[in-house]
Amino acid sequence: MLRNATKGAARRAVTELSQYPKPGEKLHGFTLLRSKHVPELELTALHLQHDKTGAEHLHIARDDSNNVFSIGFKTNPPDDTGVPHILEHTTLCGSQKYPIRDPFFKMLPRTLSNFMNAFTASDHTFYPFATTNAQDFKNLMSVYLDATLHPLLKETDFTQEGWRIGPENPQALVAAEGNAKPEDRKLVFKGVVYNEMKGQMSDAAYLFWIRFQDHIFPDIHNSGGDPQKITDLTYQQLKKFHADHYHPSNAKVFTYGDMPLADHLKEIGAQLDVFEKIRADVAHHSPIDLSSGPREVKLYGPIDPLVDANKQFKTSVSWVLGETNNVVESFSLALISALLMDGYGSPLYKGLIESGLGTDWSPNTGYDSSGKLGIFSIGLSGVQEEDVPKVKAKVQEILRSMRDKGFERSKIDGYLHQLELGLKHKTANFGMSLLHRLKPKWFVGVDPFDSLAWNDTIAAFETELAKGGYLEGLIDKYLINDNTLSFTMAPSPTFSQELAQEEETRLSTKISEVVKAAGSEEEARAALEARELKLLAEQSKTNTEDLGCLPSVHVKDIPRQKDSVILRHDNTARVKTQWHEAPTNGLTYFRAINQLENLPDELRSLIPLFTDSIMRLGTKDMTMEQLEDLIKLKTGGVSVGYHSASHPTDFTRATEGLMFSGMALDRHVPTMFDLLRKLVVETDFDSPQAAQQIRQLLQASADGVVNDIASSGHAYARRAAESGLTWDSFLKEQVSGLSQVKLVTSLASRPESDPLEDVIAKLKQIQQFALAGNLRTAITCDSGSVSDNAKALLNFVNSLPSEAVTFPSRGPPNFTRDIKTFYPLPYQVYYGALALPTASYTASVNAPLQILSQLLTHKHLHHEIREKGGAYGGGSYARPLDGIFGFYSYRDPNPVNTLKIMRNAGQWAVDKEWTDRDLEDAKISVFQGVDAPKAVNEEGMAQFLYGITDEMKQKRREELLDVTKDQVREVAQEYVVKALNNGSERVVFLGEKRDWVDKSWAVKEMDINGST
């Protein structure tokens, strides 16, 4: 009782208004403007202003130990050079108080933060972090404030992070001592942001979205930067942009959590007080004026080699709506968007996608309330050229119909129920989610207090709804007119070649300018090479400079013993059940795994399609629209997916199966179970519409898959490389890797006349065993709900098929792969991975292997692959449960050099004289993940999903804390150097096939042939 009472008092103390200044009162140079308690979110909001500069500060006091900080600036881009984006990078490269190279990245292993990053949005830039440690919070806040307000902004940092012209392989120039090969001396564009944005522009979905933004917001330029314009940015322009925009008068500061506001204000106020007030950049750019009637724009984009060439148009129709500071209307328009488009039963899905006009929504589809005026867009991808005009006509027809018919109250209630559950669900990153929700609107003048007022907004909405015709009136007001922008992107088979040719021409022009300034071609080349070598020398200082100025937490701050999650196991419902009793705010969380033995490969690979299909087809008795309505009204969502895991004591063994999950209010748990059963057992694969609906699912998955790979190409490369090493990795790659991509695109390419009988027969096979057999379950709920949940679980289990489906036993799995594999894909940059087998989770060597991965990433690979090589990212990783150690690179312009760095990294680690500080940094870095806060429904899941007991975790915790330098060198020698010498590695790269991909590589074309 005493502990609970104390906890309640602590919560009241954090959010109790009486402990804070009253409006008009001052604290550490700030004046409190207003404050408000928001009971539905269990928080108190305080809005302050810095007296001297006018900087705004929003503090959210809440009983949450995962505290958040962010400082942001209004950064309207003046052009398409990406100056806000490049400035975001260069501010983090050194500051007055921390005058070392890259303090941001060097802080990563010196903090226990669970989130650290920086983001460039269309009209603002912000720098957030989250941590549970008070000293860590102070350390990071000091680094962030100094980086943004007092950056060094050295020219070498601008050329490294922004753009430059230099020899393709400067390391070879150094090694060759003046006798470098012509290909190494070839002059190319370089720069981290330049290569990042080249990678972005390879993504057709991003290209469509950014070009749409260019036309709907002609006054807002591309803040990320267009590679064709980035090379126009000068160092002087960068410095001026910082002076004009990164000023407290133009800043918004956000703090969240249970740490004292006074402590934050004391530190922040001291940093801001050195500035004088200036005129802030508060301009809120409006979208295009469409009041004079329709406008049409047609542009060209890349062609997708894995999708039907006749179905690659993307098109959308957009309206400009009212001001987003009307939060009730903005909420209502977001609800209209959901009612029109969410789910397979929604009117726009049925009228546009189910009818065959397109395969999926366009990237800009939906209601965008991030600007001063809202934008409502409806569009499709996967459209045939002759159908492009039909899309707009069909959209307008459906909107008129919904204006006249109206929306069923049950569908509105389902949406509101999802919001209720969202408020009740206790996430581990609530503060960061709140920041992302409030921030964009705050920067365009929407009052954050209005955005926080959930109950007030819902009450006002209900009042309007009760009057009748409210939502229909909004459709009539904003969407039943032709004041539209129709935006279309057509596929061009020459787009990529034209892009490459443009870059060559631009490079020649820029080199000519350098030649003119230098006096001769020889002197120009010498100057560019000298600058590159100077940058290389500057970058080489990174591993030798004194980091004593940087603050840090210490390993001694990490508790040696971790509190266990109390779990209970029983078989009362005829299945093995793990119970976790915890405060869940009246919610019950459910998971189940049906373990499958000897599952044939051809069935496993179709499980993703099966899980999509049961959420699409409906049953004999209920349409999918009816099922979706029930899911929204009675649950927080139900899902089915594939699950596999290595055995913690033997990584060569693996189990696999289907996983089921759901969340509901306690009173709706029986309905949640019944919905899961209906979806899995009763889905009607024999309905006349089944083949067409499955084909549409395949086409939606295939549409834009090249873009999906581009956004996380290193993850696909890793999965492909790892699949040749362990059984579990092979299984995962089959359902979520390039093998799955190949299968989906091949099935999607089958002719419309194909009834997909072979596919449907296999999906029905999966249905027979999906919920039959070796089921085990896990439930997280309040103690008072256990009895009712146990009864509901028993009824659920009794309703399931009783006989398990068995498959013939198989021989030992064969998952051997070529040592080096290359996948040709149409990207301007590369993604790569090198993976090696190691040891099982419980093996003592796994702790030093994980420390080694951090040491290599932070002390070597980031420096070599990103800073010197120009890739957007690169590093090392250890997967202890899977028994894998590996390397990766992301948006990489220099794959040959990167692969060389990866292969030499093990020997580098063996030869390196590691310091105690190095080891300390690596351990701290590992524990960021080990001790990251977890949502209540994630507690105990390591044991349920992977068989990792608290004893195993505690043993590993102690081993991580006790790792020595000798152990690091030993595992580097044994599991990296020796393994590479033995040819144990698997290497995979994705990208454009060039001369360096010689006969030593197995080239795997992503061809499609329509087979399963």
From Swiss-Prot:
GO cellular component terms, A-Z: mitochondrial intermembrane space; mitochondrial matrix
Enzyme class at the top of the EC tree: hydrolase
GO biological process terms on file: mitochondrial protein processing; protein processing; proteolysis involved in protein catabolic process
Hydrolase listed as a keyword: yes
Transit peptide: first to last position: 1-13
Catalytic residues in the record: 88 (proton acceptor), 161
Binding site for Zn(2+): 85, 89, 196
KW Zinc (keyword) present: yes
Needed cofactors: Zn(2+)
A Pfam family reported for this protein in Swiss-Prot or TrEMBL: Peptidase_M16_C
Compartments where located: Mitochondrion intermembrane space; Mitochondrion matrix
GO molecular function: ATP-dependent peptidase activity; metalloendopeptidase activity; zinc ion binding
Major localisation: mitochondrion
SUPFAM superfamilies: LuxS/MPP-like metallohydrolase
The entry's keywords: Hydrolase, Metal-binding, Metalloprotease, Mitochondrion, Protease, Transit peptide, Zinc
Comment on bound cofactor: Binds 1 zinc ion per subunit.
EC number: 3.4.24.-
Family: Belongs to the peptidase M16 family. PreP subfamily.
Subunit structure: Monomer and homodimer; homodimerization is induced by binding of the substrate.
Function: Degrades mitochondrial transit peptides after their cleavage in the intermembrane space or in the matrix, and presequence peptides; clearance of these peptides is required to keep the presequence processing machinery running. Preferentially cleaves the N-terminal side of paired basic amino acid residues. Also degrades other unstructured peptides. May function as an ATP-dependent peptidase as opposed to a metalloendopeptidase.
Protein name: Presequence protease, mitochondrial
Protein species of origin: Neurospora crassa (strain ATCC 24698 / 74-OR23-1A / CBS 708.71 / DSM 1257 / FGSC 987)
Organism lineage string: Eukaryota, Fungi, Dikarya, Ascomycota, Pezizomycotina
